[in-house]
């Protein structure tokens, strides 16, 4: 079970500690989505939060349940979404940084400290931060952000599946599965595909 033990030393002197994570760096289609989550100072998770973990390790049903609990319990939360066209224009790393910063800037108030999943971050606002490799499986606030980012992105891709039914976005959410690669080979790419993400299997360079 993830606890808020990582946040507690920060809460001794700060009240606005924010967890940040993203979803959708690797897919061939769709946006990259980041979430920023601030829990109340000295928050102690109970109940369904005992099941919180890196969103990739959770079932879709549990992610949805946790997302609801996170939104209800958080002091504030926000999302940042960067579309495929922008990803192609500025590259996926820059797009991920942009999504994270958009999420932070969309919070109701400016956090005092950021806990960021991964090993790099480029803040727009002058806020102190710490990057944590595999933070979504170590830090409560980051895991919560990973769930919000993943569930929102999945919802966006499911909506896109209705517009582009031939690709099966509601199943693989844009990731490079065999079914998705086959659909691209048969139909070409659609408007939400990342043109800069090339497939060697299809001879793309």
UniProtKB/Swiss-Prot annotation:
Subcellular location(s) per record: Cytoplasm
Per its UniProt record, the required cofactor names are: Mn(2+); Mg(2+)
Q: Which residues form the RNase H type-2 domain?
A: 15-205
Example GO molecular function: manganese ion binding
Sorted alphabetically, the keyword list is: Cytoplasm, Endonuclease, Hydrolase, Manganese, Metal-binding, Nuclease
What sections of the protein cross the membrane? Answer: none
The primary site where this protein sits is cytoplasm
Keyword Hydrolase, does the record have it? yes
The UniProt record gives the binding positions of a divalent metal cation as 21-22, 117
InterPro entries, A to Z: RNase_HII, RNase_HII/HIII, RNase_HII/HIII_dom, RNaseH-like_sf, RNaseH_sf
A GO biological process held by the record: mismatch repair
The protein's annotated catalytic reaction(s) are: Endonucleolytic cleavage to 5'-phosphomonoester
Q: Which domain of life is it from?
A: Bacteria
Query: What EC numbers are recorded for this enzyme?
Result: 3.1.26.4
Q: State a GO cellular component annotated for this protein.
A: cytoplasm
SUPFAM superfamilies listed in its UniProt record: Ribonuclease H-like (SSF53098)
User: What does the UniProt record say this protein does?
Assistant: Endonuclease that specifically degrades the RNA of RNA-DNA hybrids.
NCBIfam families under this entry?
Answer: PRK00015.1-3
Name it.
Ribonuclease HII
Organism for this UniProt entry? Chlorobaculum tepidum (strain ATCC 49652 / DSM 12025 / NBRC 103806 / TLS)
- The gene coding this protein: rnhB
